[in-house]
Swiss-Prot record:
Highest rank taxon of the organism: Eukaryota
GO CC aspect terms: alpha-heterochromatin; heterochromatin; nuclear origin of replication recognition complex; nucleus
Basic residues composition bias: residue spans: 49-59, 183-193
Post-translational modification Phosphothreonine, affected residues: T24, T151, T154, T157, T160, T167, T170, T181, T258
Entry protein name: Origin recognition complex subunit 2
Amino acid sequence: MSASNKGGYKTPRKENLMSIENLTNSEEESEDLNTAMVGNAVESQPKVTSRRSTRRPSPTKKYQAYQKESNGKGQEERIVVNYVEMSDERSSDAEDQEEEESIEESENAARPAAKDLHLIQSEYNVAGTSMFGFNTPKKRDAMALAALNATPCTPKTPKTPRLGVKTPDTKRKKSMDQPKTPAHVRTRVKKQIAKIVADSDEDFSGDESDFRPSDEESSSSSSSSDAGNSSDNDAADDEPKTPSRARRAIVVPVLPKTPSAARLRQSARAKKSNEFVPESDGYFHSHASSKILTSDHTLDRLKNPRLAADRVFSLLSEIKTSAEHEGSINAIMEEYRSYFPKWMCILNEGFNILLYGLGSKHQLLQSFHREVLHKQTVLVVNGFFPSLTIKDMLDSITSDILDAGISPANPHEAVDMIEEEFALIPETHLFLIVHNLDGAMLRNVKAQAILSRLARIPNIHLLASIDHINTPLLWDQGKLCSFNFSWWDCTTMLPYTNETAFENSLLVQNSGELALSSMRSVFSSLTTNSRGIYMLIVKYQLKNKGNATYQGMPFRDLYSSCREAFLVSSDLALRAQLTEFLDHKLVKSKRSVDGSEQLTIPIDGALLQQFLEEQEKK
């Protein structure tokens, strides 16, 4: 294949050259400017050497050929430049052909080609971008963009994706968006409401039968109702539907059925029957009468209603126990007696002895007193005695042992005086034996504080016993440190004969000593006006002691007596004082037949007379 055909250039024919010359001669005057431009173009062409050009053809496009194209009407021809996409991947044969073409083009470049002249002399101008497509297009602000890209920038922190919370629609918008409930659904709901109202009206009829349908009837009724509902649904589905565009599914809330009164009663009965649990005392509750009857079978109607205290104790002493039991008790007591030297050593070291355990410790402490302390100064205190007071105990120490006279009225001042007296005679020691440190008259805070202060004196040694299981609750940390006890378990299994001699008992005539002691302690804590009011009630009750129909002192009589004695100024003040008496059970109040309020003191007349005599002496 020749180089001319490959390169796309054709050798100009002779006829073409002649036509070009004639055209130039006839239009010489009008085309002077074009001829000058042709000369300049020819002169400006560089001389081509045999050296291969260092510039490589465009990698993407190359001139293929100049083709002539007419518009179909014989008018002027125009040059159309066709581009052929070139592949970057060429074979070795194609490279050899391109070398041959470049050599041939360099040989023919020295003379102008006919096509070049034709292009210059043509009436149409060819755009430079069509011919010189290898020029690099300029970009505006390219250097500024390059400098900006070369500048290091801090990378942007990726934004945290926001959870899109949709703004709730307004009520008006919702009403506009949501379509209306279909007509057949509204009709069905209306029928159901009317049916419920009719059922509720029937429940209030006169015949309220307790008829309960069986399982078969209920199942049949439910199946029939389901069938009715399905038929209604089928009828609704058979209605012709108007075609419309797709809508959202409409959820129609099903109205809950209102339970009728009869159904509620039936469910309540069923629930009550299911929750019934038989109780052991249910029979007595069902057969008991509302009125509570008090029996008159009292101890006074017995042949021997109540015995004297001496008689009771003599009868109890005649009871004989078995020899084995007595032998065991004696063995236990002998073991405890062997502890006496240890207890004496502990007392001399500054500690105090506390005995606890089941059984009376009175006999054991008395044995220690007789056998060990017969040569020492000893003060025995019976804590179970109902009339015992701390003042009596302090007076015994100051007057009988120290010969210091009557102790001060304040118990703490009396303890201070005792401590000062013992400091003057350090060789004198006092052994204080307290039976039942937790007795009824020693359980108050004041008595325990005085005893703890006495136990802290170096010259006084305390030996006590307790019987109540909760006795340690009486003492706080300070009292325990003052007592400085050494605890000993002395379970004797002996009866509490002496400890219970003064307790209230229905079998003993002299019961009430404890109540009398309680009344003394409460009475001593009252104010002057309260004591005067209480003494008026005591005197009135003793005055009517022999009256069999005595029911109590009327409230109006008490109020008038208090007004005359200037003890109260109003009815409310008197009732406030009586409230305190009622709380401490010093007075009982009851209503008589006529509705008046009667006040009585629940203590035997002999004890009440003894109390009055004691108060008059003071």
